[in-house]
Amino acid sequence: MKALVKRLFAMAGLGVYRVGASQNNNSHTPVVTSPIHHNSKEGLEAFYSNREAVESYLDPAFYERIIDLGLTFGVGYDEKRIADIGCGTGGLLKALKNRFRPRSLTGFEYSEKAIDIARSQVPDVEFCYFDIYEGSVRQFDVIFCVEVLEHLLHPDTALRNVIGMLADSGTVLVTVPNGRIDTFDGHINFWSPESWNVFLKNVCADLSVKTGLMEDGQNNYAVITKSESLVTAN
C-alpha cells in the first residue's frame, strides 16, 4: 500500500518522505550556532571529542544500505582498492571489511580525533589525515563520499578532487541529505533531488552519473563512473 501511494504521488510530481527528527530532539546532538564554525577543524575536533554525540551519530544500518546501493549498480568490492573520504570513525570501512575481501581499505579524514578513534576501532585499516580541497594523487577503484559535501563551502571543488582520485573505470558513491527535509543547523548546503541533479551535471558533465533518492527518502545519492560521457537521472 505504501508503495502504491508513493507511485500515485509521483505521477502527480509529488514525493512522500519521512521527516527526520529535529536536532533538538536528540540530547546528544551538539547545539550549532554557526555552521561555518561547526564544520571548521576546531568544530570537528570538538564533535569527535564528545563520545555521546559520536555514538548517537553512528548508524551501522545506514552503512549497510550504502554498501548495498553500490551492489545494486553493479559495483564490486572484492579485490578492489576502496577509499572512504570523510570516513569519520571508520564505521563504513569496518562494514566493508566484515562483508568483503577488498584489496585495500583506506580512510581519509580531516579530524585527527576521528582518525584516532578509527584506528582504535579498525586497527587493520589505513587511516590518513586528508584535506579534501587539496586532493590526493592516490588512485582507487571505489570511493565513498558519504554525508560530506553538505558540510563544505566549496562542494564542487571537493567533488572534483574526489573524482580525480578514481582509477580508470572507477566509481564514486556519494550521498547527501535530502534538502527538503534536512533540519540540521550544522549543514551548509541543502540539495533537493532536483538541485542535486543540477549540481552534478555542472561538476560531472563528462562522466556517467546515476542519481536518485535512497529508499526512505532521507538522502540523495549519486553513482559516478569514470567511463562514459553520459549523465542520467533515475
Give short role names for the model-derived ranges.
Residues 146-149, 175:
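Residues lining the SAM
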Residues 1-138, 142, 146, 157-159, ...:
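Conserved N-terminal segment of class I S-adenosyl-L-methionine
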Residues 170-177:
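Conserved beta-strand signature within the Rossmann-like core of class I S-adenosyl-L-methionine
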